């Protein structure tokens, strides 16, 4: 993990996400791909959400979980999450008590409804 990533790890630092978004008139682009903030053992690049493009229910971000790392159990209460797995594989444990499990591989697309408890293990 780079020094920058260590500095961002789980800081909860508030970042102005608008500065990474270009666009107007209904089409928006995020062009910054470096990690800019950390939360729950996940490193995030700029993404698209209500905070910067006005999406009411959907959040999509570039996120990195270090090899062998875990994003501890959590719930997204007010928004949906869409994930495209670029490389590697992860195990999602989800549902009440996180008792269900599914393995995702590079190339998989994942959709998580609001209110679903889930924990992610980078395998």
Identify what each model region corresponds to.
Residues 1-57, 72-73:
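A short, N-terminal "cap"/entry segment at the start of jelly-roll beta-barrel domains
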Residues 64:
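Short proline/glycine- and basic residue-enriched helix-capping loop/turn segments at helix->loop/beta transitions
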Residues 70, 79-106, 116:
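A short beta-strand-loop-beta hairpin characteristic of the jelly-roll/cupin
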Residues 121-123:
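Asparagine-centered strand-capping/turn motif at beta-strand->loop junctions
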């Amino acid at each position: 993990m780079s020094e920058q990533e260590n500095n961002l790890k789980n800081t909860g630092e508030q970042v102005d996400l608008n500065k990474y978004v270009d666009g107007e008139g209904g089409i928006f682009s995020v062009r910054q791909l470096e990690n800019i903030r950390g939360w729950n053992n996940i490193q995030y690049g700029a993404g698209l959400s209500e905070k910067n493009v006005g999406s009411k229910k959907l959040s999509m971000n570039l996120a990195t979980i270090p090899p062998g790392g875990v994003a501890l159990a959590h719930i997204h209460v007010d928004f949906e999450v869409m994930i495209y797995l670029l490389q590697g594989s992860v195990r999602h444990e989800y549902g009440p008590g996180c008792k269900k499990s599914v393995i995702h591989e590079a190339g998989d697309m994942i959709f998580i409804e609001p209110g679903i408890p889930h924990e992610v293990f980078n395998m």
